A protein has these predicted regions:
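N-terminal edge beta-strand
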Residues: 28-61
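Sec-dependent signal peptide cleavage junction
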Residues: 20-29
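Bacterial N-terminal signal peptides
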Residues: 10-20
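Bacterial N-terminal signal peptides that target proteins for export
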Residues: 1-9
Length: 144
């Protein structure tokens, strides 16, 4: 009789232990990841629009070239060395930081930012028709 009571009590204690464990695990759900895309248009006449963009880590910035000429994007002071996802029209340069390939008219480039900070960039239009007319415009991306 004592043995049955001991087995019964052990079963109840183990059942309560597992129930407590499952209710604790249910309360620790993973935080929902929200995908954020921000678009910057590039124009040799108007520069980058918006000129300053603010967002948070995990944001994918998409640049759209609305210039007639191909453009390149280069980061100045703080370089982007780590990105989430698969960057489009970006490659890792000699210094280990991302820089863009030439983006044709109507083309896009995108980069997902994982690090916080202020990222100053310049985009250069390579004048195909008028080589002496090469232009530069600046923009800022704040990841907070």
């Amino acid at each position: 009789m004592k043995k049955k009571a001991y087995v019964g009590l052990t079963t109840i204690i183990m059942g309560l232990y597992f129930l407590a464990g499952f209710s604790f695990a249910a309360g620790n759900e993973a935080e929902e990841l929200k995908i954020i895309n921000k678009i910057i248009t590039l124009s040799t006449n108007q520069g980058a629009q918006p000129t300053t963009l603010e967002s948070r880590p995990g944001t994918t910035v998409i640049w759209v070239n609305q210039s007639r000429d191909p453009v390149e994007i280069l980061f100045l002071d703080k370089k982007v060395t780590l990105a989430c996802g698969s960057p489009v029209n970006f490659f890792i340069g000699k210094d280990g930081a991302y820089e863009s390939a030439k983006i044709p008219f109507g083309g896009t480039a995108s980069l997902c930012f994982t690090e916080t900070g202020k990222f100053d960039y310049v985009f250069k239009a390579s004048a195909t028709y008028y080589p002496l007319r090469e232009q530069e415009h600046r923009g800022i991306i704040w990841i907070k």
